[in-house]
């Protein structure tokens, strides 16, 4: 049987971020809704045509979005929180996404283990969904005019939608409300002549999946009554223990991710129904490297022996990679030739299918093999780095003294010491200086003088506010990963390699392609400038190895653990240079530590083992007198607290203001012994917290954690705030800390416990 091809979604925002510009123009009032929608429709059409020209047989439709595809489905299903029901159309859609005066936005969180963020639907107890699929069906009709029978509508599964939502009701009861709406939609698609519908159900690959059997079986039984073939799509991992019953669901086909987990082993063990289509996700939709055709073809031929009706496809939507590697003319040719962005992945899918179908693709395969050989010559292993890793000993991952003995050797501060997380407002003037320097319009000396002036101003303001521990402000940094990656060998940078993070926000992840080497100090100059303006301690500021790795496109030729340890060695040398320059405190931030957790809990220990090891390697060489800080901006610590403690950071600052002290309580209940920076106010809000509000937050915190363990800080960096918001907020924070400190000295100097 002839193998076909399919896509599950395509790159977003446009090659030149056209949708980002249109959205921000619309939000600012410079662009009308008609112009915004025209831009969106044009980009959506371009995506279809690109896939059509690549020869894809089944092309995803409905995956593109103005803001977020989960928000789209909540809107189409009529799952509108009551606070937004007075609005309609784009006003309501963007209010749900971004909030407006008196109307808080939906919560935003990570889409599984990717770096994309989705908006969390809110399903109120008495919700009575009132669907409107007009927009979705219009997209399908437009696609049919271009793609014909290749049109493959993408529908987010009701089970996945509910599992990702905030809801208080019973899953089965909520599902019974939604399933008739889904069935009606499928019947409308059938009437349009759609040959097959993709139902995306990624929740099945998570640890939750095994407990959802009853709900999933009920869903697909009811959806089957619509009379249109359903193709169940999973991605991001293997199905694990759910595999044997998922493949028995009443569906026409099932798509599986063969690039993560152990999917091929599951097929070998349990087989696959001969009468179903197997969507083989063999082209990795989340990395940027070309496949090795001979290896993938061997797997595809084995699969074809089990499932004759086979489709070759990316492992997931291509929204997680940039549009076109051919645009990156500035990259060295050997590197560029082995990169595969969305357009190149379409070509890879088509090539693999042609080869599987017996066409002569030997010349193309030989060319790819030659490109990889050229790349290997361009980026050979670095013997010094490999030897340094081989020479690592257990003591390299440990501080010289345990925490209790380090504590007395470190800088002594008043009770409830105050500090910030690191960044301060980046004004238009600062961004202009960086842009001019990048374009070569100002010299390095002129640029550094401008940055130094900002650092001096920042130090002066912090001293006037009365903070105990200062930071230099990070004015030279555009991004906490890109800044360091640009100073390390082994990372490459794109000009057009943007991917959507959320809404109009795009990120341009560095590409980790070779062994990591630090040619020279990365942060010492700015630290010295800052420290020269004050007698108070200034923290050195670094991004941790796991965050550097998780927010980049990693290599595929060596394990992630090895890549993290290489980065850690570079950071270890930076910590030593900061100490030599006079730093007595160094902060190594790891906001992405938790984000990298595998989707299956049984795989957490392996990941956390090397992730913690990487942090300990980066910081283990620090002198006992050097206080190591780390910051983690998420609110769920309970299930990984033992690993947080194993980091052995002297001070852990947390995001606590929006969690009702839940984070602090988790830490206290676990018996965490190290110092904790209580994030006492929400930097994501422009509102200036009052002294009384911060006092309340601190008093609540001290009911769980003793004063000698407590630091006081905002819950995250201040980069996106304005000075007129930052200064009064920090003044109130310092005033609250001083007031409470004086009260404690008078009454209970040893602190309070619950």
UniProtKB/Swiss-Prot annotation:
CDD domains: CIMS_C_terminal_like, CIMS_N_terminal_like
Binding-site positions, 5-methyltetrahydropteroyltri-L-glutamate: 17-20, 110, 505-506, 551, 595
One example of a Gene Ontology biological process annotation: methylation
Top-level enzyme category: transferase
Annotated catalysed reactions: 5-methyltetrahydropteroyltri-L-glutamate + L-homocysteine = tetrahydropteroyltri-L-glutamate + L-methionine
Record's keyword terms, sorted: Amino-acid biosynthesis, Metal-binding, Methionine biosynthesis, Methyltransferase, Repeat, Transferase, Zinc
Keyword Signal recorded: no
Function: Catalyzes the transfer of a methyl group from 5-methyltetrahydrofolate to homocysteine resulting in methionine formation.
Note on how the cofactor is bound: Binds 1 zinc ion per subunit.
Top-level taxonomy: Bacteria, Bacillati, Cyanobacteriota, Cyanophyceae, Synechococcales
Designated name of the protein: 5-methyltetrahydropteroyltriglutamate--homocysteine methyltransferase
Pfam families: Meth_synt_1 (PF08267), Meth_synt_2 (PF01717)
Record NCBIfam families: met_syn_B12ind, PRK05222.1
EC number: 2.1.1.14
HAMAP family listed in its UniProt record: Meth_synth
Keyword Methyltransferase: yes
Active site: 684 (proton donor)
Protein family: Belongs to the vitamin-B12 independent methionine synthase family.
Cofactor (UniProt): Zn(2+)
